[in-house]
Amino acid sequence: MTLLETTNEGAAEPVRLTTPLGQAIGNLFARALPLLDGNPPGSLKVFVFGGCAVHLLTHARGSADIDAEIEAARVLRKDEIMAVYTPPEGYEDGDGRDLQVYLDQNYTNALGPLHEDYRERAIPMEGFEGEQPLHIFVAAGVDLAISKLGRFTENDQYDIEQLIECGRVDVGQFVTLATEAIDYAVGNRSAMLGCLKLVIAKYLEDGRDATSGS
């Protein structure tokens, strides 16, 4: 079973940075490593959300900005860390185009639906785990899908469908956890439940196993 076919998020292998955008994301966050020298493992934790997280899990569409929650130990100067993250990271995509990705320093995950246990399901990024002072995680597919029920733009719906089709989201678990998250989320509860119903309808109607893609 390949990374993109893994359906059990709890047992998922670390996310590998095998695309130009993925490598650029890793390079951007690695800038903080000189500031973390001598600190314990996980002194700086990063949780990646948004379009970049969807790309890392599915290799589908990318994004020019990184949505991430950043948690620094008290001994660290978070302002210095954020300063080294300010410049964009350049990379060349598969078509030879020069592109950039940057960290959205205004991002917060407090404004949309998000399940309270998302950290337990987050998937480590290869090379940024274990004894490293910098631990980077990608939000699990189901938690990414839940987070996209707030705005639910056309891109958000597409992202959820890609996560389901790539086996990163089990529809049954999605319904259960999304309903729980919406109960305590900020925003219009009925609207978010309507978006949930809309995006899962075709998978339930088809009678498909949501993780099989068949």
Curated annotation (Swiss-Prot):
The modification Phosphoserine is found at residue 63. It comes from the Bacteria. InterPro entries: DUF6036 (IPR045792). The keyword Phosphoprotein applies. Keywords: Phosphoprotein. It holds the Pfam family DUF6036. The keyword Phosphoprotein applies. This is Uncharacterized protein PA14_35840. It comes from Pseudomonas aeruginosa (strain UCBPP-PA14).
